[in-house]
């Protein structure tokens, strides 16, 4: 057995946990820090497909990373919270496109080349997807940046609104100019 293996064998669980915490803290200290979230139009010739916009984390070492969302509703909700940092209000969703016209419009702008194209869904499906999307957003952002630095937390009720802060304090938000009309 090597000296390193012997030293590991002699360590208690507490010592191992302490060393691991120390190494993880050092890694975190040296890791590039996010400085901005950007919603960027893809530079593509054919936009007849889906997923026309990317959500990108820009870091202080001049690198960038695309956030991978589990589904399109998660991306929609996250971009919506960037455009509306106070979150969205859950209303009676008898007719989602009428109750949430800005969400339907933003959905078409992000995912469809034809902004007039209709979205087929029922009110129940829409409500369910929006609820699940909030959870998926938290998971994607946690994986990318880490929850302890975010204020996204659990949705909180504030004067009847479900408030989902977009990003932690000090992070710049850059939105593609074509989506600015959705603010």
Across the structure, where does each feature detected by a protein language model lie?
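Intrinsically disordered, low-complexity protein-interaction/activation regions
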Residues: 1-183
